[in-house]
Each structure stands twice: as structure tokens, then as C-alpha cells.
Swiss-Prot record:
The gene is PLN. This is Phospholamban. It comes from Homo sapiens. One of its GO terms (cellular component) is sarcoplasmic reticulum. For practical reasons, PLN activity is most often studied with ATP2A1 instead of ATP2A2. Changing T17A: No effect on phosphorylation by PKA. Coiled coil: none annotated. Phosphorylation by PKA abolishes the inhibition of ATP2A2-mediated calcium uptake. Phosphorylated at Thr-17 by CaMK2, and in response to beta-adrenergic stimulation. Phosphorylation by DMPK may stimulate sarcoplasmic reticulum calcium uptake in cardiomyocytes. It is a single-pass membrane protein. Its main location: endoplasmic reticulum.
């Protein structure tokens, strides 16, 4: 889990150093947020299935 956090942090740092048009950055941010939400939902579903 810590490695994943480290990887995402370094990826975010790398992405922020690259100059990007504002619109592209906004789209990327939205994609990233959606991806995180989907991951959280999948984790919740897995936990619920394990508990049942």
C-alpha cells in the first residue's frame, strides 16, 4: 500500500513538472479523480463481499 502511495505521489510530481495546457490538466485531473472513485468503490464492494 505504501509503495502505491509513493508511486502515485511521484507520478503526480512528475505530471506537475511537465508544462501542460490548462484544459488538458483539468481533463487529466477529472480522469484521475474518477479513477480513484472507481477504485474506492471496488474496494468497498470487495470488503462487503468478504464480510457477507
Amino acid at each position: 500500500m505504501e509503495k502505491v502511495q509513493y508511486l502515485t505521489r511521484s507520478a503526480i510530481r512528475r505530471a506537475s513538472t511537465i508544462e501542460m495546457p490548462q484544459q488538458a490538466r483539468q481533463k487529466l485531473q477529472n480522469l484521475f479523480i474518477n479513477f480513484c472513485l472507481i477504485l474506492i468503490c471496488l474496494l468497498l464492494i470487495c470488503i462487503i463481499v468478504m464480510l457477507l
